[in-house]
């Protein structure tokens, strides 16, 4: 699925937990933290191991950011 988010969120940088929460990939911030601790979240095919990681416009690859949750759930986050 493709999810649209506002460019202003990434312009100044946003915490990875808030980024995933704004994209509505998981239901709660605690669920996101748990998935990060279990190494279940990838951004652009790189495992996220730090829940304080900042996501910004530098993560854009072909105008989108690929977020994976688990083995089979993959999302493209595009800038609106």
Protein language model annotation of sequence segments:
Residues 1-80:
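Conserved nucleotide- and phosphate/pyrophosphate-binding catalytic cores
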